[in-house]
Curated annotation (Swiss-Prot):
Family, similarity comment: Belongs to the deoxyhypusine hydroxylase family.
Residues annotated as binding Fe cation 2: 231-232, 264-265
Pfam hit, one: HEAT_2
Localisation per UniProt entry: Cytoplasm; Nucleus
SMART domains assigned to the protein according to its UniProt record, in alphabetical order: EZ_HEAT
Single biological process term from Gene Ontology: microtubule cytoskeleton organization
Protein name: Deoxyhypusine hydroxylase
Organism: Candida albicans (strain SC5314 / ATCC MYA-2876) (Yeast)
């Protein structure tokens, strides 16, 4: 039986691992993503810790792959497990200069999501020394997130209950009169003199407000010079699934001068939103010269088919 014939929803952990790492050499990328999400489900939710840790170990085996898109998703998933067992795998990726920038960035962000205090010296090192701005900025955010999570301030802040279950690079700004005003949040979002962590907090507060006005305020962030910042806005749009964001996402995806990490996130967001105008746009990028954009279009179209079929979720756990 080939990997693509295995029922991913009933597969054993070992079968899921073999699909994820493409043991046969001919497994569809979309199926590898589905296997990843199902392993994540076990790694983050299984009450049997030995089984959960086995799933995490199997997920981390994929860091030897060539696909930048898949490896960055692997790092993201490990950060969402809430299990420090994943931290050594992520530290190793951050330290490996042979890994692509997008993968190393996601590993650093995942260490922040795990709240891993033991990783602070490593994050400080790369915040100060890494030649890549995206890595330095990610480490800055991860450091701030870990400090915030372990602070008195975090205990006393009133955060509105979010619709989203993701562990984000920064918490939304605390709820008060000024953070309920979209215009004020837009100012913070776009103020390059403010700390990046505070700007991200405004970003996630706008996401949680979720109105069309909030979406358009977020879209203004696509004018920022930071690829990291812009890719996070595209990611947030993929979570929100509000069709009002489609024109700005299409514009970003079509801009070949834009960083691959931003364009790929725009493609995935369009796949999540999955309105009729998204389909031909995504199809036009199936042969893009940037591998991570091309792979994202493939996965996004697969997501599109799921969203427009009777399947309720892209995988067992999204």
């Amino acid at each position: 039986m080939s990997a693509d014939e295995v029922n991913i929803d009933t597969a054993s952990l070992e079968e899921l691992r073999d699909i994820l790492i493409n043991k046969t050499g001919n497994t569809k990328l979309a199926n590898r993503f589905r296997a990843l999400f199902n392993l994540k489900s076990v790694g983050s939710e299984d009450s049997d810790k030995e089984r959960a840790h086995k799933a995490i170990k199997y997920i981390a085996e994929c860091f030897n792959d060539d696909s930048e898109l898949l490896k960055h998703e692997v790092a993201y998933v490990l950060g969402q497990t809430k299990d420090l067992y994943a931290a050594p795998y992520l530290r190793e990726v951050l330290e490996n200069d042979n890994q692509q920038c997008m993968v190393r960035h996601e590993a650093a962000e995942a260490l922040g999501a795990l709240g891993d205090k033991e990783s602070l010296p490593l994050l400080e090192k790369y915040f100060k020394e890494d030649p890549l701005l995206e890595i330095r900025q990610t480490c800055e955010l991860a450091i701030e997130r870990i400090h915030w999570e372990n602070s008195e301030k975090a205990k006393n802040e009133v955060l509105e209950k979010s619709l989203y279950t993701s562990i984000d690079p920064a918490p939304p700004l605390a709820t008060n009169d000024s953070t309920s005003k979209v215009e004020k949040l837009k100012e913070i979002l776009n103020d390059q003199d403010k700390p990046l962590f505070e700007r991200y907090r405004a970003m996630f507060r706008l996401r949680d407000i979720g109105t069309d006005e909030a979406c358009l305020a977020l879209a203004s962030g696509f004018d920022d010079p930071s690829a990291l910042f812009k890719h996070e806005i595209a990611y947030v749009f993929g979570q929100m699934c509000n069709p009002v964001t489609v024109p700005s996402l299409i514009k970003v995806l079509k801009d070949e001068s834009e960083a691959g990490m931003v364009r790929h996130e725009a493609a995935e967001a369009l796949g999540s939103i999955a309105t009729d105008e998204c389909l031909p746009v995504l199809q036009s990028f199936l042969n893009d010269s940037e591998p991570v954009v091309r792979d994202s279009a493939i996965v996004a179209l697969d997501m599109y088919e799921y969203e427009n079929s009777n399947e309720l979720e892209y995988a067992t756990v999204k």
